[in-house]
Amino acid sequence: MHAPHAPVRPQWLAQVSEAPLDPNRAIIDAHHHLWDRPGQRYLAEDYLADIACGHRLVASVYVQCRSMLAVDRPEPFQAVGEVEYANGVAAYSASGVLGELRLCAAIVGGANLLLGDAVAPVLDEMLQRAGPRLRGIRNTTAWHADPRLISNPRPPPPGILLEPAFHRGLAQLQRRGLVLDIWAYHTQLGEVLEVARTFPELLIVVDHLGGPLGAGPYAGQRDAVFARWSADLRQLAQCANVRLKLGGLGMKVAGFDHHVASRPPGSAALAAVWRPYLLQAIDCFGAQRCLFESNFPVDKGMFGYGVLWNAFKRVVADFAEADKDRLFSGTARETYKIEG
């Protein structure tokens, strides 16, 4: 099995450092993780070190990654430990010790929606432990038959998004006013569309640009993938209940392979290769329904945090101020009900 993500190499990353562009613009990082895995520790202090690069981060959205599970509890309730941990980080930040930054201001937990109606007590306990900071749920759903296209340490089986039990779980999610985050590849956007049409009142956030693939059988097929991804994304955008996270292109499955170079890319280089994807996505959904994300530390194996945000800022430099405000903070604030 291929390692799902490029390894983080601090010395390699340190070769490129940039001053922040548009440094006073408020940013809500709509997607990051914290974990303590063997050889891959990335906790709050590590994230804080990354964001201390001059950009004005005002809040962040923590997204489930099977971190800090309550292993002494029955399996369905182990995911409660993760939201409890993230809420503790958020409480520390909310004390004002980090200035205006509200770390983990919104939390996307990992309750197993395949439990169907039985997920209800898990969701209720998560809400009890994390309170209003619990804003959504995400399950592991990105699947492809090719083993080179694995982006999760625990790959899911196929077809989860269409399972009747999963849909019963979605009904429980909707009943509680929670958001559904979905990470799926571009080959699965038809399944995402079916979910969006089946649950028109459920707010759905599609992660990582809808997963345009560039590795495995899609290596060297970028034009064909872009055409299919664009068409499916435009169809999905017709569902008013769907929003799109812009980012995640530093994963190996995206196929850009910045990690094999002797030096990490600068923001101008990233902007050049990302611009078609970002502009197409924004054209489909509009700035009102798009939100920028770092996907750190997953994408950290390819480029630095400050470089990432400079690349985003370069791509939308000519946008209206109101649209930039939506992309960098407003859409995330509205979607995940972040106060401030």
Annotate each predicted stretch with a short phrase.
Residues 1-26, 42-50, 58-59, 276-291, ...:
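Mid-to-C-terminal alpha-helical segments outside catalytic/metal-binding sites
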Residues 31, 60, 86, 107, ...:
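Conserved, mostly hydrophobic/aromatic
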